From Swiss-Prot:
GO terms for molecular function: 4-hydroxybenzoate polyprenyltransferase activity. NCBIfam families: ubiA_proteo (TIGR01474). The chain crosses the membrane at residues 38-58, 98-120, 141-161, 163-183, 213-233, 238-258, 268-288. This is 4-hydroxybenzoate octaprenyltransferase. Keywords: Cell inner membrane, Cell membrane, Magnesium, Membrane, Transferase, Transmembrane, Transmembrane helix, Ubiquinone biosynthesis. Its EC number is 2.5.1.39. The keyword Membrane applies. One of its GO terms (biological process) is ubiquinone biosynthetic process. It catalyses: all-trans-octaprenyl diphosphate + 4-hydroxybenzoate = 4-hydroxy-3-(all-trans-octaprenyl)benzoate + diphosphate. The lineage of its organism: Bacteria, Pseudomonadati, Pseudomonadota, Gammaproteobacteria, Enterobacterales. Belongs to the UbiA prenyltransferase family. It is found in: Cell inner membrane. Pathway: Cofactor biosynthesis; ubiquinone biosynthesis.
Length: 288
């Protein structure tokens, strides 16, 4: 009986951490790898790869926990989220706090194996991860904060590899903010009607009828900035081929969003995983 209860509790924790939905971790992992490879101009050390890969999954899990904790009084009113562990009572508020602290603690132990500059940067990263879920109460620009939080691994990666934060680092950071606004607006379009009812803010609500147009403009700006990244990092032709393929995927996403229906918008969101992967392959092959 106790074993069954423990298994049930672990299942609830895993759902709270979104272990069954790795898309969020992957969208965080690809920009981290872009940064590590560009900073090293080669394959990064095994130690740094292990620290940042594990850190991505731990901090994404921590982000999901604090996000659900912040939304615990709202999720019960949204069809897609009403069965999440906190609103359903499968996980208590105290358990969520302990789980969040444990995940952050493990992440910080990993960071302690890196240089002091990276350790200090991680403190700012934690602050961004903490405030992100609460921004939706006061601003429609939640996705911008998400981009900064998700992208903070970029300056941390450059710091860990080279102990410097060159221009290409910040251009890449800006690229990630734009990308986060793109894919999280697509994600928010799925919940727009529910969010309007309960008073939660998002860029999908802010952009309104111009959502597809603004996403398209952001996609174009992102591609232009990635061309600049290629120039600053002296990346090869294979990178620009990958960039062209990513642009085609953005066109495909626009087609998916044409009627603003929930399922196709969610599919457009998921498609961004391939954008990140293809860009990483282009960067990886450029340094072989």
């Amino acid at each position: 009986m106790e074993g069954s209860m423990a298994l049930s509790k672990w299942h609830a924790y895993s759902r709270l951490m979104r272990i069954d939905r790795p898309i969020g971790s992957l969208l965080l992992l690809w920009p981290t790898y872009w940064a590590l490879w560009i900073a090293a101009q080669s394959i990064p050390s095994l130690h740094i790869l292990i620290v940042f890969t594990a850190g991505v999954f731990l901090m994404r899990a921590a982000g999901c926990v604090i996000n659900d904790f912040a939304d615990r009084h709202f999720d019960g009113h949204v069809e897609r989220t009403k069965h999440r562990p906190l609103p359903s009572g499968d996980v208590t508020e105290k358990e969520a706090k302990i789980l969040f602290a444990s995940l952050v603690g493990l992440s910080f132990l990993l960071v302690l194996t890196l240089n002091s500059m990276t350790i200090w940067l991680s403190v700012a990263g934690l602050a961004l991860a903490w405030i992100y879920p609460f921004v939706k109460r006061v601003s429609h620009l939640l996705q911008v904060v998400l981009g900064a939080a998700f992208g903070w691994s970029i300056p941390m990666g450059f710091s860990a590899v080279s102990e410097s934060l060159p221009l290409v680092c910040w251009v890449l950071f800006l690229v990630n903010i734009l990308w986060s606004v793109i894919y999280d607006t697509q994600y928010a379009m799925v919940d727009r009607n529910d969010d309007l009812k309960i008073g939660v803010k998002s860029t999908a609500i802010l952009f309104g009828q111009y959502d597809k147009l603004i996403i398209g403009i952001l996609q174009i700006v992102m591609i232009v900035l990635l061309v600049l990244v290629g120039s600053l990092a002296d990346l090869g032709a294979v990178y620009y081929i990958a960039l062209s393929l990513s642009a085609l995927l953005f066109i495909y996403q626009q087609k998916l969003m044409v009627d603003r229906e929930r399922a196709p918008c969610f599919k457009a969101f998921l498609n961004n995983n391939y954008v990140g992967l293809i860009l990483f392959i282009g960067i990886f092959l450029s340094y072989l």
